[in-house]
Amino acid sequence: MILRAALVCVMAATPLAAQQVTSAPGGELRVLDKITGEVTDLTLATGETQKVGPLSVTLGDCRYPTDNPAGNAYAEMTIYYRDGADPVFRGWMIASAPALNAMEHPRYDVWVLRCMTP
């Protein structure tokens, strides 16, 4: 039992190999209007803002695994509703699991599709 506990401590202290990531020049996002069913795809450069209806969507960064450009993209976004003072979403969203950090809005969903790769 003591040996097992010591092994767990050693494994916890050993850093995991970090996955190398690359920042893309931009990304692709999808916006869904849950009332009308309208879907809009956005292609944004890093730092660019686009309006979709009452939403203003800004892409801060889009990153992907360096060794697998088609792999799991994740993007940092800031989204405002009707030019409000406070964003309805600010943070990172993972393309393969947008629900992990989802935008909470009664009418709109926004999620990452992919990063633009060279």
Q: What feature does the model see in each segment?
A:
Residues M1-V8:
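Sec-dependent signal peptide recognition
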Residues L3, L16-P118:
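N- and C-terminal low-complexity/disordered segments
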